[in-house]
């Protein structure tokens, strides 16, 4: 089996580690030539996973034509949601090379202008390729260190999805197939915003009871959006790895970028400076704007998510935000 990963950030690199154990080769592509040269020379992604050495069968490249021409079993799209459309458009004219190759999307969130989820963006631009979502509780560093995790591969084609899940799973990197591609993406999008709220509560030293309150209310908001987008709620999605599992992981440790961001806010940091100076993408920050627009369009209320939006972009005081989310 050959696999190709487009996106050499922390998660794309970690997935390369996971797939290297049962692939003859893994292509890891990134658009920045200098960064990819550094990874190739050092056999480490010094920017994101500096302590993890790449296995020899991971081939590092900044040449997208080269990696797409390698006829992979599947292509993994591992870029932030707000960059996903640009990536798909950049390979659209090469679709004849990888036509019908399954695309596994790791992006989490909602696109700013279109208010589309990642699978909807991919299906719009690359309609001939089966699209799946790969999501669940999975910190990149732990995947790269071969620590156990269980995540979900969601898509409409059950036979193909089940086959891919079996091929890319190994002893520590376990994949569960689900047909609920929408529910999985809703959980993935909202959990990052809820994690910011949990971080704020943690930064203010309000205790574990308060964190549990935010997680519980956050789960209800995931359910609210899910019901508004699809009346046939799948309970196994809500209580499975991609919703409840990912929510718990992201909301209970400072290893989560989103929770860490919230902790810093709770400790009194200047929010505008944080928004302008943060070098790493905080998915909850980039998701909350389109989410609130989508909620208005669907005529639903998401109190915690709205409170985080108002704090970040409407200058609502921190104490008022804490009161609202609790």
UniProtKB/Swiss-Prot annotation:
<dbReference type="InterPro" id="IPR013328">
    <property type="entry name" value="6PGD_dom2"/>
</dbReference>
<keyword id="KW-0444">Lipid biosynthesis</keyword>
<feature type="binding site">
    <location>
        <position position="138"/>
    </location>
    <ligand>
        <name>sn-glycerol 3-phosphate</name>
    </ligand>
</feature>
<dbReference type="GO" id="GO:0046167">
    <property type="term" value="P:glycerol-3-phosphate biosynthetic process"/>
</dbReference>
<feature type="binding site">
    <location>
        <position position="258"/>
    </location>
    <ligand>
        <name>sn-glycerol 3-phosphate</name>
    </ligand>
</feature>
<keyword id="KW-0560">Oxidoreductase</keyword>
<dbReference type="Pfam" id="PF07479">
    <property type="entry name" value="NAD_Gly3P_dh_C"/>
</dbReference>
<dbReference type="GO" id="GO:0005975">
    <property type="term" value="P:carbohydrate metabolic process"/>
</dbReference>
<feature type="binding site">
    <location>
        <position position="281"/>
    </location>
    <ligand>
        <name>NADPH</name>
    </ligand>
</feature>
<keyword id="KW-0520">NAD</keyword>
<feature type="binding site">
    <location>
        <position position="283"/>
    </location>
    <ligand>
        <name>NADPH</name>
    </ligand>
</feature>
<feature type="binding site">
    <location>
        <position position="11"/>
    </location>
    <ligand>
        <name>NADPH</name>
    </ligand>
</feature>
<keyword id="KW-0521">NADP</keyword>
<feature type="binding site">
    <location>
        <position position="257"/>
    </location>
    <ligand>
        <name>sn-glycerol 3-phosphate</name>
    </ligand>
</feature>
<dbReference type="InterPro" id="IPR006109">
    <property type="entry name" value="G3P_DH_NAD-dep_C"/>
</dbReference>
<comment type="function">
    <text>Catalyzes the reduction of the glycolytic intermediate dihydroxyacetone phosphate (DHAP) to sn-glycerol 3-phosphate (G3P), the key precursor for phospholipid synthesis.</text>
</comment>
<dbReference type="InterPro" id="IPR011128">
    <property type="entry name" value="G3P_DH_NAD-dep_N"/>
</dbReference>
<dbReference type="GO" id="GO:0008654">
    <property type="term" value="P:phospholipid biosynthetic process"/>
</dbReference>
<keyword id="KW-0547">Nucleotide-binding</keyword>
<dbReference type="Pfam" id="PF01210">
    <property type="entry name" value="NAD_Gly3P_dh_N"/>
</dbReference>
<feature type="binding site">
    <location>
        <position position="140"/>
    </location>
    <ligand>
        <name>NADPH</name>
    </ligand>
</feature>
<feature type="binding site">
    <location>
        <position position="246"/>
    </location>
    <ligand>
        <name>sn-glycerol 3-phosphate</name>
    </ligand>
</feature>
<dbReference type="GO" id="GO:0005829">
    <property type="term" value="C:cytosol"/>
</dbReference>
<protein>
    <recommendedName>
        <fullName>Glycerol-3-phosphate dehydrogenase [NAD(P)+]</fullName>
        <ecNumber>1.1.1.94</ecNumber>
    </recommendedName>
</protein>
<comment type="pathway">
    <text>Membrane lipid metabolism; glycerophospholipid metabolism.</text>
</comment>
<dbReference type="InterPro" id="IPR036291">
    <property type="entry name" value="NAD(P)-bd_dom_sf"/>
</dbReference>
<dbReference type="InterPro" id="IPR006168">
    <property type="entry name" value="G3P_DH_NAD-dep"/>
</dbReference>
<feature type="binding site">
    <location>
        <position position="31"/>
    </location>
    <ligand>
        <name>NADPH</name>
    </ligand>
</feature>
<feature type="active site" description="Proton acceptor">
    <location>
        <position position="191"/>
    </location>
</feature>
<dbReference type="GO" id="GO:0047952">
    <property type="term" value="F:glycerol-3-phosphate dehydrogenase [NAD(P)+] activity"/>
</dbReference>
<feature type="binding site">
    <location>
        <position position="136"/>
    </location>
    <ligand>
        <name>sn-glycerol 3-phosphate</name>
    </ligand>
</feature>
<feature type="binding site">
    <location>
        <position position="108"/>
    </location>
    <ligand>
        <name>sn-glycerol 3-phosphate</name>
    </ligand>
</feature>
<keyword id="KW-0594">Phospholipid biosynthesis</keyword>
<feature type="binding site">
    <location>
        <position position="256"/>
    </location>
    <ligand>
        <name>sn-glycerol 3-phosphate</name>
    </ligand>
</feature>
<keyword id="KW-0443">Lipid metabolism</keyword>
<feature type="binding site">
    <location>
        <position position="10"/>
    </location>
    <ligand>
        <name>NADPH</name>
    </ligand>
</feature>
<keyword id="KW-1208">Phospholipid metabolism</keyword>
<dbReference type="GO" id="GO:0006650">
    <property type="term" value="P:glycerophospholipid metabolic process"/>
</dbReference>
<dbReference type="GO" id="GO:0046168">
    <property type="term" value="P:glycerol-3-phosphate catabolic process"/>
</dbReference>
<comment type="similarity">
    <text>Belongs to the NAD-dependent glycerol-3-phosphate dehydrogenase family.</text>
</comment>
<dbReference type="GO" id="GO:0051287">
    <property type="term" value="F:NAD binding"/>
</dbReference>
<dbReference type="InterPro" id="IPR008927">
    <property type="entry name" value="6-PGluconate_DH-like_C_sf"/>
</dbReference>
